[in-house]
Amino acid sequence: VSDRDILPGPATGLVPTVEASPDKLALRRFLRNPAAVAGTIALVIVVVVTLIGPIISPFEPTAIDLTQVRKPPSGEHLLGTDSTGRDVFSRLLAGGQISLLVGFSAALVAVAFGTLAGVVAGWFGGIVDAIISRIIDIMLSVPAVLVIIVLAGVIGPSVPMLIIVIAGLAWPNPARIARGVVLSLREEEFVQAARAIGSRTRFILARHLVPGALPPIVVSATLLVAESVLLESSLSFLGAGVQPPQSSWGNMLNEAQSLTVLSSMPWLWVPPGLMIAVIVLSAMAIGDGIRDAIDPRKN
């Protein structure tokens, strides 16, 4: 499929139309990427099913039934039950809401704050850039899991704590990307022209620089969603994240710490493990697809 459509004309027979916009070209390239399309479909399905979880859940996710302990999948319990007789399918849906809430919220906060910090550093330069750059370097060297475990012990593990701490540890990546883009754009002629005619700094940043930084930041955001979901699941598995009776995919995997469960009760750990894998792989595929679609070398 050509990026330029040819339409019949009255004089020459063929008249080239206006070339497709960069956005349309990027979308076209994204839709030609099978992995990115499959990842998008999978992610949308998981998110939609999780959101309507309270409607389609056959049981309360926290309802205990000691007469149904560790029952295999059946017509009554589609994915079986856990060690206290709770329905695994209902817990999977409820846990998905928590895991996705943490993943998307942490990524959104990190991208918003990181973009702001990076744009400020790149635009003002000098001591402002030096201070923010040193903070970014320090934050990138901090072991995230260790910090969250320590804070969970001091503050107490909770969903808001996870979102804030994960976002606080993740913002340097989008900040570094935004800073690099602004540094490369601030000396461009269109930016200098805007400054020469007296445009306010806020207008220049919002109109010219932030839009230029958005494509790579969107790619970073999709990867941050995957990292945040994976980090929340790891922490909940270790007991430093979401706490029972509230469910998350991570603390559902906590049930699979014995060889007996691993070998003979796969319904307890395969569903949450599969959901984590689907979200992480889908987000990474989408990020790769967006990166390839906006790559200037493909124009």
What are these regions (language model features)?
Residues 1-42, 285-299:
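Transmembrane alpha-helical segments of polytopic membrane transport and secretion proteins
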Residues 3-9, 41, 49-84, 234-247:
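Hydrophobic alpha-helical transmembrane segments of membrane transport/permease proteins
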Residues 24, 34-44, 83-299:
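Alpha-helical transmembrane segments of integral membrane proteins
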Residues 29, 56, 78-81, 261, ...:
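Residue-level signal for helical boundary/lining positions with a hydrophobic bias
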Residues 30, 48, 138:
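Residue-level signature of catalytic and energy-coupling elements of molecular machines
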Residues 40-47, 147-150:
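Hydrophobic alpha-helical transmembrane segments of multi-pass integral membrane proteins
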